[in-house]
Protein backbone atom coordinates (compact mmCIF):
# COMPACT_ATOMS: atom_id res chain seq x y z
CA UNK A 1 0.00 0.00 0.00
CA UNK A 2 1.46 3.40 -0.95
CA UNK A 3 2.20 5.92 1.75
CA UNK A 4 -0.34 8.63 2.54
CA UNK A 5 0.43 12.22 1.60
CA UNK A 6 0.69 14.34 4.80
CA UNK A 7 -1.87 16.83 3.47
CA UNK A 8 -5.54 16.39 4.28
CA UNK A 9 -8.99 17.94 4.13
CA UNK A 10 -11.38 18.35 7.05
CA UNK A 11 -15.02 18.84 6.00
CA UNK A 12 -17.56 20.22 8.46
CA UNK A 13 -21.01 19.11 7.31
CA UNK A 14 -23.64 21.34 8.90
CA UNK A 15 -27.21 22.57 8.65
CA UNK A 16 -28.35 26.22 8.48
CA UNK A 17 -29.13 26.08 12.22
CA UNK A 18 -25.56 24.83 12.86
CA UNK A 19 -26.12 21.18 13.66
CA UNK A 20 -22.92 19.34 12.81
CA UNK A 21 -22.36 15.81 11.52
CA UNK A 22 -19.89 13.75 13.58
CA UNK A 23 -18.58 10.28 12.73
CA UNK A 24 -17.32 7.68 15.21
CA UNK A 25 -14.07 6.04 14.10
CA UNK A 26 -14.16 2.27 13.58
CA UNK A 27 -10.49 1.81 14.53
CA UNK A 28 -10.89 3.80 17.75
CA UNK A 29 -14.46 3.58 19.10
CA UNK A 30 -15.35 6.66 21.10
CA UNK A 31 -13.22 8.92 18.87
CA UNK A 32 -15.53 11.33 17.04
CA UNK A 33 -14.62 13.52 14.09
CA UNK A 34 -15.86 15.33 11.04
CA UNK A 35 -15.18 13.97 7.55
CA UNK A 36 -11.43 13.93 7.01
CA UNK A 37 -8.91 12.31 4.74
CA UNK A 38 -5.60 12.55 2.95
CA UNK A 39 -5.00 14.08 -0.43
CA UNK A 40 -4.31 11.64 -3.24
CA UNK A 41 -1.73 12.28 -6.00
CA UNK A 42 -2.98 14.76 -8.59
CA UNK A 43 -5.96 15.98 -6.55
CA UNK A 44 -6.77 19.56 -5.65
CA UNK A 45 -7.75 20.13 -2.03
CA UNK A 46 -11.36 20.70 -3.11
CA UNK A 47 -11.33 17.35 -4.92
CA UNK A 48 -9.94 15.69 -1.79
CA UNK A 49 -12.71 17.19 0.36
CA UNK A 50 -15.40 16.19 -2.15
CA UNK A 51 -14.07 12.64 -2.55
CA UNK A 52 -13.70 12.03 1.18
CA UNK A 53 -17.23 13.33 1.77
CA UNK A 54 -18.64 10.87 -0.77
CA UNK A 55 -16.51 7.95 0.48
CA UNK A 56 -17.23 8.43 4.18
CA UNK A 57 -20.89 9.54 4.07
CA UNK A 58 -22.29 9.02 0.58
CA UNK A 59 -23.03 12.76 0.41
CA UNK A 60 -22.72 14.32 -3.05
CA UNK A 61 -21.25 17.77 -2.40
CA UNK A 62 -22.37 19.08 -5.80
CA UNK A 63 -26.00 18.35 -4.90
CA UNK A 64 -25.64 20.82 -2.02
CA UNK A 65 -23.74 23.60 -3.79
CA UNK A 66 -20.24 22.19 -3.31
CA UNK A 67 -17.76 22.42 -0.48
CA UNK A 68 -16.65 25.85 0.74
CA UNK A 69 -12.92 26.37 1.28
CA UNK A 70 -12.41 28.28 4.51
CA UNK A 71 -8.84 29.08 3.39
CA UNK A 72 -7.71 27.87 6.80
CA UNK A 73 -5.08 25.25 7.48
CA UNK A 74 -3.64 23.67 10.59
CA UNK A 75 -0.48 21.69 11.10
CA UNK A 76 -0.54 18.98 13.72
CA UNK A 77 1.59 16.09 14.87
CA UNK A 78 0.52 12.72 13.48
CA UNK A 79 -0.20 10.29 16.33
CA UNK A 80 2.75 7.87 16.60
CA UNK A 81 0.38 4.90 16.14
CA UNK A 82 -0.55 6.23 12.67
CA UNK A 83 2.90 7.37 11.42
CA UNK A 84 3.58 4.05 9.67
CA UNK A 85 0.98 5.11 7.07
CA UNK A 86 3.19 8.02 5.94
CA UNK A 87 6.66 8.21 4.36
CA UNK A 88 9.46 7.46 6.84
CA UNK A 89 10.32 10.47 8.98
CA UNK A 90 6.95 12.17 8.49
CA UNK A 91 5.69 13.51 11.81
CA UNK A 92 3.24 16.29 10.85
CA UNK A 93 0.19 16.72 8.64
CA UNK A 94 -1.26 19.90 7.16
CA UNK A 95 -5.05 19.90 7.28
CA UNK A 96 -7.20 22.25 5.16
CA UNK A 97 -10.69 23.13 6.39
CA UNK A 98 -13.82 22.99 4.22
CA UNK A 99 -17.53 23.11 5.00
CA UNK A 100 -20.69 21.83 3.34
CA UNK A 101 -24.15 23.05 4.27
CA UNK A 102 -27.06 20.63 3.88
CA UNK A 103 -30.68 21.74 4.41
CA UNK A 104 -31.32 19.47 7.40
CA UNK A 105 -29.76 16.48 9.16
CA UNK A 106 -29.69 13.81 6.48
CA UNK A 107 -29.19 10.07 6.60
CA UNK A 108 -25.63 9.19 5.67
CA UNK A 109 -24.15 5.99 4.30
CA UNK A 110 -21.17 5.12 6.46
CA UNK A 111 -18.08 3.33 5.20
CA UNK A 112 -18.08 0.51 7.81
CA UNK A 113 -14.32 0.04 7.62
CA UNK A 114 -13.92 3.69 8.67
CA UNK A 115 -16.86 4.60 10.92
CA UNK A 116 -19.25 2.88 13.33
CA UNK A 117 -21.97 5.49 13.73
CA UNK A 118 -22.86 9.12 13.24
CA UNK A 119 -24.58 11.93 15.13
CA UNK A 120 -26.03 15.31 14.30
CA UNK A 121 -25.38 17.68 17.21
CA UNK A 122 -25.65 21.43 17.81
CA UNK A 123 -22.21 22.91 17.14
CA UNK A 124 -21.59 23.76 20.83
CA UNK A 125 -22.15 20.09 21.77
CA UNK A 126 -20.27 18.70 18.76
CA UNK A 127 -17.02 20.62 19.32
CA UNK A 128 -16.04 19.12 22.70
CA UNK A 129 -16.92 15.61 21.50
CA UNK A 130 -14.12 15.68 18.88
CA UNK A 131 -10.80 14.10 19.85
CA UNK A 132 -8.84 16.37 17.49
CA UNK A 133 -8.04 19.91 18.63
CA UNK A 134 -8.16 21.18 15.04
CA UNK A 135 -11.59 19.63 14.48
CA UNK A 136 -12.86 21.17 17.75
CA UNK A 137 -11.46 24.55 16.79
CA UNK A 138 -13.03 24.46 13.32
CA UNK A 139 -16.45 23.63 14.76
CA UNK A 140 -16.08 26.44 17.32
CA UNK A 141 -15.45 28.84 14.40
CA UNK A 142 -18.48 27.59 12.42
CA UNK A 143 -20.93 30.31 13.62
CA UNK A 144 -18.59 33.12 12.52
CA UNK A 145 -18.01 31.55 9.10
CA UNK A 146 -21.70 30.93 8.46
CA UNK A 147 -22.62 34.45 9.58
CA UNK A 148 -19.92 35.94 7.34
CA UNK A 149 -21.19 33.91 4.35
CA UNK A 150 -24.75 35.12 5.03
CA UNK A 151 -23.58 38.77 5.11
CA UNK A 152 -21.82 38.32 1.75
CA UNK A 153 -25.02 37.16 0.03
Go through each PLM region and give its residues.
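Active-site segment of metal-dependent pyrophosphate-handling enzymes
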Residues: 59-106
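Conserved N-terminal beta-strand and adjoining loop/helix that marks the start
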Residues: 1-20, 41
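Short, well-ordered beta-strand micro-motif
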Residues: 13, 24, 99-101
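General beta-strand recognition
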Residues: 19-22, 33
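The catalytic Nudix box helix
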Residues: 34-71
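Short connector loops at helix/strand junctions that flank enzyme active sites
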Residues: 6, 29, 34, 65, ...
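NUDIX/MutT-family hydrolases
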Residues: 96-139
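Short, basic, low-complexity termini and linkers enriched in Ser/Thr/Gly/Pro
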Residues: 148-153
